[in-house]
A protein has these predicted regions:
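Non-transmembrane catalytic domains and loops of membrane-associated enzymes and transporters
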Residues: 1-155, 415-425
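Single-residue recognition of alpha-helix boundary sites
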Residues: 20-21, 64, 101, 180, ...
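Alpha-helix boundary/capping detector
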Residues: 43-44, 73-77, 167, 174-175, ...
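Residue-level signal for alpha-helical context at structural boundaries
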Residues: 58, 65-66, 159, 166-167, ...
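Membrane-embedded multi-pass helical conduit in multi-pass membrane proteins
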Residues: 83-168, 184-245
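Short membrane-interface loop/juxtamembrane segments of multi-pass integral membrane proteins
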Residues: 171-183
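Structured alpha-helical
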Residues: 183-425
Length: 425
């Protein structure tokens, strides 16, 4: 039966089935999809449950021991479980350079140049290797943001689960809610803000030590400051994630490209293409002129195999050839037919799977930089008035420093001579 000893019953049941000799097959065809969480707090709550459950399995039914699993299966299961123990190492990474800058403690007893010569090539090589292997599905550097957002919250439950694996209960993740206004979740972002302030103190002390400290430590101070700035960019991205965007759709839209037709009440028929749909409406593009009016009733014709179905709709908006349709009340049979024509199609999620652009590490790094600065801009935008004064002063200071950066003068456009003879010379 289903394993109930842990809060991640699906992974635990899968492990037990493999131990008993059952085999599983991976099908690279998306069969279904589920809603994501609407808020960062709900997302973190879901990941806390996942992290606790996987560590519980690691303690109660460790895949590295026991019988029934092949070596590859043991490694894969152990990797999936140990991944959720990244909270404490990530927090150490975000504060490690501060040990030297603030406390004068050497976490790595080696010259700064030697550390850079060993660490930088390894980081570049690891990033390029991951991009080559997983570039079609994952983008470089984004896991840094993901782990930073979760680190503070998954570290305590995973540590407790290692000590007492029976502690914890199953919590259902709420989905499908609405977000009326854009806002910053100050409660969730509080740990990131504390880490930002701590790293800013480290930068200030590092600059002071760079100017007035011993000469033999200048290079080490410089490397530590660069490390702190990298951490500040990652923390800025974590702050940007805590900004909740407005979510007013009650039904999630699914992208798709499907031929269809729309019939007006007077009998005129127009071919169109469905480019997105939900349980309450559709977005279509009419092939040609959109000869429908907003508020007009019509019938949408969809096909499944050789069978054709008609659904009553109302034109909600018209923007050129782009038309938004709202489904009118359907009978039970019509609703079943609509689901069969849309959500239940075998190729429903094919477009979603193939729509990801391939990873380009430098572009991903640039996106991370933009996200980090955007996080601090949102922090200033949504902060109390008394704090905004400080942010404005810092922004003015950064702009003043940036004004000293040399700029390449614009090249004057060449002037054409009016004399053809001179032009030939």
């Amino acid at each position: 039966g289903i394993a109930v000893e842990t809060v991640t019953e699906d992974a635990h049941t899968s492990l037990r089935l493999h131990r008993r000799g059952y085999t599983s097959a991976y099908m690279r065809i998306p069969q279904a999809a589920g809603l994501a969480t609407e808020s960062l707090s709900a997302h973190i709550g879901q990941r806390i449950r996942w992290a606790r459950g996987m560590v519980q399995i690691f303690r109660l039914d460790n895949p590295l021991f026991g019988k029934g699993l092949k070596l590859v299966q043991r490694v894969c299961y152990a990797n999936a479980m140990l991944h959720f123990l990244s909270g404490i190492p990530r927090l150490i990474f975000l504060t490690a350079p501060l040990a030297f800058l603030l406390l004068h403690a050497y976490i790595i007893y080696a010259p700064a140049l030697m550390i850079a010569l060993f660490v930088l090539p390894h980081m570049i090589h690891a990033s390029l290797t991951n991009s080559k292997i997983q570039g079609k599905y994952r983008h470089s550097f984004w896991s840094e943001i993901y782990e930073t957002v979760l680190a503070w919250y998954i570290a305590p439950p995973t540590f407790v689960a290692l000590i007492n694996p029976h502690k914890g209960k199953f919590n259902v993740t709420a989905k499908g809610g609405l977000v009326e206004e854009e806002y910053v979740d100050w409660v969730i972002s509080r740990p990131y803000i504390y880490l930002v302030l701590l790293n800013l103190v480290g930068v200030a002390v590092g600059i002071w030590r760079f100017m007035y400290g011993p000469e033999n430590e200048i290079l080490t101070v410089w490397v530590s400051i660069v490390w702190v700035f990298y951490n500040l960019i990652i923390l800025g991205g974590a702050v940007a994630v805590s900004v909740e965007s407005k979510q007013v759709r009650r039904s999630h839209r699914v992208e798709m490209s499907m031929p269809a037709a729309i019939a007006r009440e007077d009998g005129h028929l127009f071919s169109c293409t469905v480019h997105d749909y939900s349980d309450g409406g559709l977005g279509i593009k009419i092939n040609g002129d959109a000869q429908v009016l907003e508020g007009q009733n019509a019938r949408l014709l969809l096909k499944r195999g050789q069978q054709e179905y008609a659904f009553p709709v109302r034109v909600a908006r018209v923007n050129g050839s782009e038309v938004g349709l709202q489904l009118l009340p359907l009978t039970n049979q019509q609703h079943i037919d609509f689901v069969q024509c849309t959500f239940a199609r075998a190729d429903t999620w094919a477009l979603w799977q193939d729509s990801f652009p391939e990873d380009k590490p430098m572009e991903s790094l640039l996106d991370i930089l933009k996200l980090g600065f955007r996080g601090y801009r949102h922090l200033a935008e949504f902060s109390p008035p008394s704090v905004k004064v400080v942010f404005r002063a810092l922004t003015s200071l950064v702009a003043w420093i940036a004004s000293f950066v040399p700029r390449r003068p614009e090249r004057a456009a060449p002037t054409l001579s009016a004399d053809p003879a001179m032009a030939q010379q």
